[in-house]
Amino acid sequence: VILGSAGMRIVTAGDMVCFAGISGGLNVSIKNDYNITVLRGQSVSEILLSPEKIGYTGIESPTVVLALSDEGVARRQKIFAALSPDTYVLKEASVAIPGTPAQVEELDFKAMKIKKTDWALASLAVLAKHEIVLNKDMLVFALKSRFNEKLFNLSMETVDKLI
């Protein structure tokens, strides 16, 4: 689950996770939640990756939560208390999250001089570094599949800062 705000490229990051999953031979499902008002409000992507056929697309207990904005967290705040201790939460330092039994890693993307519009991509790079859900090869495949050469190279600059 990716929790962000409008303009943070959350839907694009969700697409990247799907492309990465497909490259790994997985079945994928994505649901996006965002306001129709341009550049306002929450942006949330719920992604399922499974080696099995996906019948039910609801997420009851996510494996990973990327908490990148207060607006996104507010939209899905109830999930935090129900997360398992095995769930990995990556939280941007400026974002407050409710109490959770999950494993929480905090990163300060602003201090790393990563633009807010690249926080979602940076989070995927962290997942790839830790080999949680995806690895670097899967992420690179996804970026190459989705972007032209110029955008791919710009994206890789962000990825390389974190891997």
Residue spans for each PLM region:
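Active-site cofactor/cluster-binding pocket
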Residues: 1-163
